[in-house]
Design a protein with these regions (language model features):
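The feature marks helicase ATPase cores and/or their adjacent C-terminal helical subdomains
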Residues: 1-163
Length: 163
């Protein structure tokens, strides 16, 4: 039963799933925004709103695949050789994204992580990243959670500081 649920979710979030025209336009708008702001020294935020089940996660999965293809293969892209992560603070959804990454040449499982893991990893190495795509942002912590090794006050703020 668990594998059936994961396989169904994997199909729904696959970057090979056909997008509606509206979703495709949104992916293109976000890519345009990202390439415009990638070389700036300050963060830029693009927020996608929508009710549950409207396809936000599908859009983000397609978007991140496009970003990583550009980052890893398109020498003429402003995104070429950028360091990018997809963050989700839900273990089962993260598992689905990692499953998808295992099947695609330009997505690596290590590209997908939980917010606290990314924040702590970047702090440890004293590094920043170029692009962070956040799915299910309402699940980000807005207070310290030492039990889960999050010692700051707001995960969104901390991710923005590191991007």
């Amino acid at each position: 039963m668990q594998n059936t649920i994961i396989n169904s979710a994997t199909e729904k979030l696959s970057p090979f799933k056909t997008l509606t025209a509206e979703q495709e336009n949104l992916v293109n708008d976000i890519l345009s925004f990202t390439t415009k702001h990638i070389k700036q020294d300050y963060p830029a935020i693009f927020t996608v709103y929508g009710d549950a089940g409207t396809g936000k996660s599908v859009v983000l999965a397609h978007l991140f695949n496009e970003i990583q293809v550009a980052a890893r293969t398109k020498e003429d892209s402003p995104l070429y050789q950028t360091t990018n992560y997809f963050v989700v603070n839900h273990p089962e959804i993260l598992k689905v994204y990692k499953e998808i990454a295992g099947d695609l040449p330009h997505l690596y499982k290590k590209d997908f992580t939980r917010p606290t893991s990314l924040i702590n990893q970047l702090d440890k190495k004293d590094e920043t990243v170029d692009v962070v795509v956040i799915d299910e942002a309402h699940l980000l912590l807005s207070r310290s959670d030492p039990y889960n090794n999050f010692t700051y006050n707001n995960q969104l703020v901390e991710l923005i500081k590191r991007a």
